[in-house]
């Protein structure tokens, strides 16, 4: 799991303290609870020195019925919106790094019995690896300027 996904999970847990499942969902999971699978990733070109990865995280919320699950999903989505769509980025030890994850889109929808879904999207930029090139030392000109 990357630090951005972990930071989003921590933010959701701070607003709704229920068990969070991140691997396979067990047969007998606790209700209410959250299921956070790994995000889907889409790559894009960005600048001459960076590329962009857009993440889509499909969080499932489980409650006693679908209406309660959707209400909780809407409440959590509003908590992210009220924070200006900014979630503090946490280190692996759980400490704030001073950076933020900017959420670009949140979608909530009702699911099957006792289930709702939140789709959370954000983008991150990464630098290309730079190869070492020899530095130009001298330029010799054989003809004059016209």
Swiss-Prot record:
Source domain of life: Bacteria
Family per similarity comment: To B.subtilis YqbJ.
Entry protein name: Phage-like element PBSX protein XkdJ
